[in-house]
Amino acid sequence: MSEKTVERGRRKVRIGYVVSDKMNKTIVVELEDRVKHPLYGKIIRTTSKVKAHDENEIAGVGDRVQLMETRPLSATKRWRLVEVLEKAK
């Protein structure tokens, strides 16, 4: 018998900064997106905050982290921590 492997969709990967780590195994990360205004051409910075799963609780406030999209882990968590890219100073 041969096992069939199901191809999964590509997961989104984002880089952002931790703004809160007060919850158990959860961090709040601020993601920044830069969009060019369609008419005037000015680059506009928009930010969004997402909750991410941090199983080992290694990330702290101010850390630069990499997140990956995952299945819904709770009512508001849809991201998980991949790695801490840079610790806060």
Curated annotation (Swiss-Prot):
CDD domains registered for this protein in UniProt: Ribosomal_uS17
Annotated Gene Ontology cellular component terms: cytosolic small ribosomal subunit
Keywords carried by this UniProt record: Ribonucleoprotein, Ribosomal protein, RNA-binding, rRNA-binding
Top-rank lineage group of the source organism: Bacteria
GO terms, molecular function: rRNA binding; structural constituent of ribosome
A GO BP annotation: translation
Listed Gene3D superfamilies: Nucleic acid-binding proteins
Family (UniProt): Belongs to the universal ribosomal protein uS17 family.
NCBIfam families the UniProt entry points to: PRK05610.1, uS17_bact
UniProt function note: One of the primary rRNA binding proteins, it binds specifically to the 5'-end of 16S ribosomal RNA.
Assembly: Part of the 30S ribosomal subunit.
PANTHER family attached to this UniProt entry: 40S RIBOSOMAL PROTEIN S11 FAMILY MEMBER, SMALL RIBOSOMAL SUBUNIT PROTEIN US17M
Listed name of the protein: Small ribosomal subunit protein uS17
Originating species: Nocardia farcinica (strain IFM 10152)
Phylogenetic lineage: Bacteria, Bacillati, Actinomycetota, Actinomycetes, Mycobacteriales
